[in-house]
Amino acid sequence: MRYLKAAALYLSALLVVSGAGLSSVWAQPPRFSVVAPGIAHAIFEVRPPDGEPFSGHAFKIDLDVAELRLVSAAGPSSKQTVEQIAAPFPAAVAVNASFFDNEGRAMGLAVDEGRLMASGKRHSWGALVVSGTNARIVLGSDIPDHRVHRLIVQGVPRLVVGGKVQRLKPQLAERTAVCAGGSIVTLVVSTKAETTAFARFLAGPPETGGLGCVDALNLDGGPSTQLVAKLSVLTLSLPGGWGVPNALVAIPAKR
């Protein structure tokens, strides 16, 4: 989103990435710092040789320590900003999640704490699925029974599958994405980025400057992309262009 680049300027460490083609060479490894129990943060700036540069924030959530929730918008409207959705939590990191239809209703399956929030499962879409403290990204068709999972949110397209960048439609837009594997979920927000360049950054090995995502899913982007961090050592408010139906909210463990 358009506010991310300006907001990132005051942070001290940037990851500068450059390279060519599928074998991109990243200048620095990601510099994640623990900002709360179970939550680590890094900022990045990516400069593809054949596309527009982009920058943003990544948060690694350790589900063995921190809690991840899918929280719906409240009040008379079916949509709120992520800042409004996260307002009840004194300490949290939150990003937008589900795509939504013309009536503002979340598209795809949406489940939080085992409670069904949206039932329109999209078989061909990807889905972040959390069972206990284990997170993975699967196809909607691979979810026969939503009731056995603690959290589900669907998105499209799957950017990275099994460590491989997928064939993706070219598009330049602000990005919100999630990576998942085992007990680690990574939330990523970015300024305008071309789809494949963004996916290559997500999949790139950490030692060459990527995030090392084995599986990554695109969530709603464009004006929906927004981020809020309310932590004792880090405060961010990166607003989008409109309200959204829900948000992924990471809640740090109490000290």
PLM features: what roles do these ranges have?
Residues 1-12:
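Bacterial N-terminal signal peptides that target proteins for export
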Residues 10-20:
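Bacterial N-terminal signal peptides
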Residues 93-97, 130, 215-219:
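General beta-strand structural signal in soluble alpha/beta enzymes
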Residues 103-122, 168-180, 184-218, 224-255:
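Conserved, well-ordered active-site substructure
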Residues 54-56, 88-89, 123, 154, ...:
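Extracytoplasmic
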Residues 56-60, 127, 177, 247:
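Conserved hydrophobic/aromatic beta-strand scaffold that supports enzyme active sites
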